[in-house]
Amino acid sequence: MKITDVECICLRVPEMEGACEWGEDAFIVKVHTDEGIVGIGESDTSPTVARAFVEAPMSHGTSNGLKRIILGENPLEIQKLWDKMYWESNYIGRRGIGIHAMSAIDIALWDIASQYYGKPIYELLGGKRRDRISAYGTFIPVYPAEGNRELVRNLKAQGYRSLKFGGGPFGSDPDRDLEILSVIRDEVGDDFQLQVDVAGMWLTYDHALEMIEKIRPFNMNWVEEPIMQDDLEGYSKLAGIEGVNISGGETLTTRYEFEEFMSKSDADIVQPDITRCGGISEMMVISRMAEEKGKKLVPHGFSTGILLAATVQFLAAARGGDLIEYSQSTSPLFKDLVKNMIPFEDGYVRVPDTPGLGIQLDEELIEKYRI
């Protein structure tokens, strides 16, 4: 079997200058083969920039577009192709958008292999360790703060027992942050599990320290990305605060960045995104690294049902895969792109036993939002 094409699909719902905080854009790849098997992958990244990286012409031996690197290759040789893409694009890649694009292709290759062998991806990764995975919901809060009551009330009614919020109006105004936190905690009650995603908005160690102490009475399960992940010393000091769990890692790529982050940040929880960190292949490496270093791994996931399906397959096989993020985005790219999206049911998502990612894309929706 040989790869005949790498098709890049860029989707965007709003106007080109609009924000996509709710997941209103997407980068999808379809890897085509001469045997008719098509693999699907995605990256939660800038779609048009990722497409440019995949389709780039060759400048020299280590400055090559990913499509050129893998055309004509055997898609079942997944690790070989990961290494080949990494090496032959390292002059322009190695981190960031280059690995984001590689992640999408890697997921598509696992989809192909799983379909070819007629077995679920988790079986190719070593076997299924769990039939279902605990899920927490993630939403973007609103302001005025009272508007969050109905949001979280509806999520509790759906069966969520753990929620995370961040983005939107949260992070840039301390008084507003505390007001939003107060309303949400009051609505869910003291025994309900809450996480907060700051997305680096507290900027400095001193400001983050001040805010962490202010939100301590709200009993947060973890504080995610309080500062930029470049500030490893600041992370380490925040992680040393008693009774507070610090998490991060969604913007990091490859085992190399995660090794440094785990070793120097002292973060309690690491959060690689399977569509950014290097795909399923690299996620398995990072997972083993986290286990060796005594870190809890909770994957980041706030994009389409493609990301969700890939993350479920990984967590089904991972030793420590006991928690998954479930987006509450209202974007049609989250709700409708995958026709048979894995559902949330009473606190869990169940692991499908179908070969491949087991998903069906809405091709009419793709054509509607393709750019």
Regions found by a protein language model. Give the residues of each.
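Structured beta-strand/loop patches that form or line metal/cofactor-binding pockets in enzymes
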Residues: 1-40, 44-51, 330-335
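Conserved, mostly hydrophobic/aromatic
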Residues: 3, 36, 105, 118, ...
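Metal- or metallocofactor-binding catalytic centers and their adjacent structured scaffolds
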Residues: 32-116
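A cross-domain feature marking catalytic cores of carbohydrate-active enzymes
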Residues: 43, 137-139, 165-167, 196-200, ...
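Glycine-rich, aromatic-flanked loop segments that form ligand/cofactor-binding clefts
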Residues: 97, 106-142
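Metal-dependent enolase-superfamily TIM-barrel catalytic cores that perform enediolate-based chemistry
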Residues: 126, 131-242
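Shared catalytic-loop signature of beta/alpha-barrel
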Residues: 213, 219, 230-348
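C-terminal extensions of enzymes
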Residues: 335-371
